[in-house]
Amino acid sequence: TFAMEKAPVEEEIHFDGYEEVKAGIVKWPMSVIRLNSRNRKKLTELAEKILNSWRGYTDEAAFIFAKTDGEPHNTITPIARMREGNYELDLVLRNNITTPEHPLGVYHPHQELHHIKKENIGLIEVMGLAVLPARLKEELAAVAEKLVKGEDLRADEKTAPHADWAEEIRKRRTITPDNALQVVYEETGLVFAKVLEHAGVYKRTEEGREAFRRFVKQVR
């Protein structure tokens, strides 16, 4: 079971004409609408309506643009499951717009997280399981070792990309030979949570929630 499947709905929402479909915003770092119903036809009809609405949706105040220079940006990652005999769909709102500051994407892991994760966020990761580059196994072990020995992280090409992050960990965590690798792994998990936050089109702030509600309200 993926973490997203266990995540609860934190705010119920309603769509006119779809009273048979329970809908809500999921408590998750990315922006997710969950639909649940026994009526598969109504569920898929509403999901399609949300997808089409999102594809054409622009909200400049929230930095969401359906298109720039003719290139479409909005899409949805859908995740389907059965839950206690009901059909359930999680619709994850995505947007691939880029800017000079974020050439790989505004809603993509930002530069400061690239030492851990630079690649695109795929379906498995959206659901809460980190798929991390193989290079990290060796690199994180080297980071842990240098933290224990108090060695210079910038002097070794394996640890140099992680130096800023590791030095910040060193300031707030007690590192011992016994716990060093575990601490580094825990901190890597926190970076992955940040990766998902960066990929979320609506941030988990009051402003972000308001903007999310604006989108939901205009779905027709």
Predicted regions and their residues:
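Generic, low-specificity signal for short hydrophobic/alpha-helical stretches with a mild N-terminal bias
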Residues: 15-17, 28-29, 73, 108, ...
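Catalytic or ion-translocation cores adjacent to nucleophile or general acid/base/metal-coordination motifs
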Residues: 1-48
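Sequence termini and other peripheral, non-core segments
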Residues: 75-78, 84-220
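N-terminal start-of-chain detector that recognizes signal peptides
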Residues: 5-7, 62-65, 97-101
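Flexible loop/turn segments at secondary-structure boundaries
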Residues: 9-11, 41-43, 71-73, 98-101, ...
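General "foldedness" signal
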Residues: 15-16, 47, 64, 68, ...
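Active-site/ligand-binding surface loops and adjacent short beta/alpha elements
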Residues: 34, 38-80
